[in-house]
């Protein structure tokens, strides 16, 4: 029996090595035949044989983990095909390719299933001693918030100095221009209620007023850089305070101090955190609020709350709704489940939920119209069908009737629709959306859309996957931090500029760009891996009978859903709230698991 298991493990090791090292192409398999590559394959196969021989039959298989392993395997195989070919041809292209793909899936599945079961075993059984901290760190015990705040500030200082006054992205530049009364592309995308009102709800109004208002302060005193630095100070205080509070809270619930200090190190030293803390973009404050929201959700699910705590929580919910236009979805997809999973909190949470929904409706349907502020365009919600139509027009435009082309033209403009199609970005397609489209014209468009869905569903599937696969496939990458000066404000006549520390900026930028390639730690800058970790956390909560705490993951999953229907593939700032919350969430859930196992 033992010999039989060893043979099985050897075969699985060979198959998994094939999965990791061989590439499928339209012409067959691709593998380097150099001595180095052959040696690599041999070493990997031997390592995996030893690994499987030790762990493959050690654990009683959990169905949840098998399902997750299957999902991860499918994501690897299909993600590769869409990343390389833009369709599923490297999965279903021919009989031989199908066989190669199935073998790859088997190899991935065995590896993921074994590794996940091993990880669960380590998490459940491994004990980490909470040793006494060195004297220099004894201050952490006495003042965890202040200690963490100061450490993070010190680590962020090089970024604050190098990127004074602040890094600005494209949206932030336009938000500032709105406040300064300068025409922006947002005005072209919406039906204006008053042509003299330049502010729109394309970006959250509260953030537009914050960044634009502080910029205007600088403008009025003759130094726009100072105004932007005021904004960076506000944002830095918010971000660092939330990070420090998360460390304080982890210490409060008695998480192992070694692990807490590791998380402090991550928030202080991983470059994406200081880079975004110094980047004026709406997602940063929102991401900090989401981290705080996840912590408070756990606190509510775990401990009895006072009236004051519920009031503060309601204020937090309101800020989430106001600081991101899609923040409402995070609340709607998480708070009701908290009520379902813990009946003791149903009344106060229901009151908070109804109150904030009412505020949201009143804000969007009453306050903004009364101020003649135009709401965002419906086109922002229609990236998926618009991309599907554009892909159909690009590859099968000759199949679309003249009558249907006229219907599409009323909504999207048909003549150059196929040329505007980009598989991983819908901006060029949706930016030509006719803002005066009537409900009847939109209805006719969707009738045409549905007609061609039935005719070629594969085209629609390809269009959708091309626009989202990067959120689930770890082997693809894109930019993830802002490092350059945005020229939109200088072009508008404002003296926004960086200082002369080009060398320091080059060093920090190089560190930021290199970080994703650091083993293990770099995964936090990989969108696909971040999503995988959340899926894995979900599985571990189910397996270890901690379903009540699934609610802590719902904010992240709601944001991932928004990414799926969003305009861009592998867009890091869209997933930023999930990244901000992840380190603290891992320790909160780990601590809850260890506490339960020790009872």
What residues fall within each predicted segment?
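Short acidic/glycine- and proline-prone juxtamembrane loop motifs at membrane-interface regions
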Residues: 170, 275-285
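Transmembrane-helix motifs of polytopic, lipid-linked glycan transferases
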Residues: 110, 114, 230-254
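Start-transfer (signal-anchor) and selected internal transmembrane alpha helices
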Residues: 1-15, 37-72, 97-158, 592-599
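Membrane-interface anchor segments at the N-terminal boundary of transmembrane helices
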Residues: 27-42, 226-230, 466-553
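Membrane-proximal stem/loop segments at transmembrane-domain junctions that anchor or position
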Residues: 371-499
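Membrane-proximal lumenal/periplasmic loop motifs of glycosylation machinery
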Residues: 162-169, 180-238, 279
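Membrane-interface alpha helices of multi-pass inner-membrane proteins
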Residues: 310-324, 335-336, 353-360
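Transmembrane signal-anchor helices characteristic of membrane glycosylation enzymes that use polyprenol
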Residues: 12-23, 69-82, 142-168, 355-368
């Amino acid at each position: 029996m033992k010999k039989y298991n060893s043979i099985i493990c050897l075969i699985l090791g060979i198959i998994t090595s094939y999965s990791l090292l061989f590439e499928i192409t339209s012409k067959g398999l691709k593998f380097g035949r150099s001595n180095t590559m052959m040696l690599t394959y041999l070493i990997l196969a031997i390592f995996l044989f030893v690994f499987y021989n030790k762990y493959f039959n050690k654990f009683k298989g959990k169905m949840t983990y098998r399902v997750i392993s299957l999902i991860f395997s499918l994501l690897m195989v299909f993600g590769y095909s869409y990343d390389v070919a833009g369709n599923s041809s490297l999965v279903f292209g021919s009989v031989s390719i199908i066989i190669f793909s199935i073998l790859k899936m088997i190899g991935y599945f065995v590896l993921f299933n074994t590794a996940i079961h091993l990880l669960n075993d380590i998490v459940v059984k491994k004990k980490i001693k909470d040793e006494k901290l060195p004297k220099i760190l004894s201050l952490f015990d006495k003042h965890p918030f202040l200690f963490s705040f100061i450490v993070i500030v010190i680590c962020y200082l090089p970024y604050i100095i190098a990127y004074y006054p602040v890094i600005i992205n494209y949206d932030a530049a336009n938000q500032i221009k709105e406040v300064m009364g300068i025409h922006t592309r947002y005005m072209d995308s919406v039906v204006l209620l008053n042509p003299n009102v330049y502010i729109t709800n394309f970006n959250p109004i509260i953030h537009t007023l914050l960044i634009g208002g502080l910029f205007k302060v600088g403008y009025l005193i003759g130094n726009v850089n100072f105004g932007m630095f005021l904004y960076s100070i506000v944002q830095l205080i918010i971000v660092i305070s939330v990070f420090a509070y998360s460390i304080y809270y982890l210490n409060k619930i008695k998480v192992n101090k070694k692990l807490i200090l590791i998380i402090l190190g991550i928030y202080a030293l991983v470059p994406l955190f200081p880079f975004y803390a110094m980047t004026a973009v709406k997602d940063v404050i929102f991401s900090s609020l989401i981290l705080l929201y996840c912590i408070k959700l756990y606190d509510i699910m775990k401990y009895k709350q006072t009236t004051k705590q519920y009031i503060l929580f309601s204020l937090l919910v309101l800020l989430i709704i106001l600081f991101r236009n899609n923040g409402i979805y995070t609340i709607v997809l998480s708070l009701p489940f908290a009520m379902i999973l813990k009946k003791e909190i149903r009344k106060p949470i229901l009151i908070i939920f109804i109150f904030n929904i009412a505020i949201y409706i009143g804000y969007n349907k009453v306050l903004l119209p009364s101020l003649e502020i135009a709401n965002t365009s419906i086109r922002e919600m229609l990236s998926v069908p618009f991309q599907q139509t554009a892909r159909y027009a690009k590859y099968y435009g000759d199949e679309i009737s003249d009558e249907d082309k006229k219907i599409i033209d009323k909504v999207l403009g048909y003549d150059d629709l196929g040329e505007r199609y980009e598989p991983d970005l819908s901006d060029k397609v949706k930016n030509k959306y006719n803002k005066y489209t009537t409900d009847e014209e939109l209805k006719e468009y969707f009738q045409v859309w549905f007609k061609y869905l039935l005719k070629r569903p594969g085209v629609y599937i390809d269009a959708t996957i091309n626009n989202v696969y990067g959120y689930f496939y770890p082997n693809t990458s894109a930019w993830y931090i802002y490092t350059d000066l945005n020229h939109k404000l200088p072009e508008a006549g404002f003296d926004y500029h960086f200082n002369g520390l080009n060398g320091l900026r080059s060093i920090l930028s190089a560190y930021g760009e290199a970080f994703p390639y650091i083993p293990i730690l770099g995964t936090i800058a990989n969108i696909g891996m971040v999503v995988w970790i959340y899926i894995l956390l979900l599985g571990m909560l189910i397996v270890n009978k901690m379903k009540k705490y699934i609610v802590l993951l719902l904010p992240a999953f709601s944001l991932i859903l928004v990414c799926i229907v969003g305009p861009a593939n592998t867009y890091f700032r869209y997933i930023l709230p999930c990244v901000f919350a992840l380190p603290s969430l891992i320790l909160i859930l780990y601590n809850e698991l260890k506490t339960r196992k020790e009872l």
